[in-house]
Curated annotation (Swiss-Prot):
The keyword Hydrolase applies. InterPro entries: Allantoicase, Allantoicase_dom, Galactose-bd-like_sf. This is Probable allantoicase 2. It is an enzyme of class 3 (hydrolase). Transmembrane segments: none annotated. It catalyses: allantoate + H2O = (S)-ureidoglycolate + urea. One of its GO terms (biological process) is purine nucleobase metabolic process. Coiled coil: none annotated. It holds the Pfam family Allantoicase. Pathway: Nitrogen metabolism; (S)-allantoin degradation; (S)-ureidoglycolate from allantoate (aminidohydrolase route): step 1/1. Keywords: Hydrolase, Purine metabolism. Its EC number is 3.5.3.4.
Amino acid sequence: MAAPILDPNAPAFTRRYMNLADPRLGAKALFASDEFFAPKERMLDPEPAVFIPGKYDDHGKWMDGWETRRKRTTGHDFCVVRLARPGVVYGVDLDTSHFTGNFPPAASIDACVSDADTPPDDAVWETLVPATTLAGNQHHYVDVSNPRAYTHLRVNLYPDGGLARLRVYGQPQRDWSRAARGELVDLAAIENGAYLVAANNEHFGPASRMLMPGRGANMGDGWETRRRREPGNDWAIVALARPGVIRRVEVDTAHFKGNFPDRCSLQAARVAGGTDASLVTQAMFWPMLLGEQPLGMDSVHTFETQLAALGPVTHVRLNIHPDGGVSRLRLWGELA
C-alpha cells in the first residue's frame, strides 16, 4: 500500500498547494552560512525525515536535515533557497523531526524577487514569516497572508541548530501572455497554478499528487482512497489553472494494479462566486464532461472524442467508481 498521510491534522494548505521548495521541480538550496553537521540540501528532501541510530560521519551524528555548528559568536545562521517556480506562498512547514537537543529556539523566513539564480547583495528582502518559536521533533505549520509572488527565500535560524525539512506551500505564477492562441495547455498542472479544492477521501495518498508533473514514481506517488465498503463512489475537485475549453483528458493509473478504479467520469463547470467549500455541494450537479469510462491497471487512458462540448470551464470533478488509486490527471485545453 501507499504510505498513509503522515499528519492528518495538517492545515489544508499542505494538501491543496504544491511545495515550491521541492527539488524535484527545480528548487535548490543555494547558500548557507554554516552546514557543518548536515548539508543544506537535506532540508529540501521531499521524503519525510528519518533517524538512524548509531549512524555517524566525520562531523558527528548523522542527521537528516540541515544542521549548523554551535554558534559561539553573535548573529544567526541562514540559508538561501531558490523556489522551483515563482509563486504566492500560503503556508510553510518548519519541521524539526528528530532534532531534540539541537533544534533552533526560533526561525523566520524572508523572501525576495530576483531574475538571477542567486539574489544579488542589494536584493530587497521582505519578511514572509516573522520569528516563530520552535520546539523539538515536530512540525510547525505557519499560515502566510501575502499576495506577492516570490522567487527566493532566506531561512533564518536563531541562533543555530538543525531543521529537518522546509516545506513551502504555494501557487505558482505563470506568464499566460506567452501562451499561443489555440495552444493546448495542461490546465490541471499544479505548476501552472491548478490546485485541489477538495476530495472525499485521501487515506493512502493526497489527491493533489495527481496534479504533479511527470509520471508517478511508485504507487505512493498518487491519489489513493481507502476500500469503499458502502454504496457510492470517491471524488476529487480541481480548480483549473485558468478558464479553458478542455480538449483532451488523460487519466494515468501508473503503478496501480490491484487497486485501480473500475471506472471514471468527469463533471465540469464555469464557476463564478462562492467559496471552495461551497463547491463541494455544487459539484454534485455539474454537467458531465466525460461519461463513465472503464479503466485498466498501470496505464495512461486518453479521452478526446468522448468529451462533451461544455465550453470554457474553471473547475472539474473527477469521479472514480467505486474507489482506488489514480497517479496523474491531465486536462489539456485551450485558454478561454
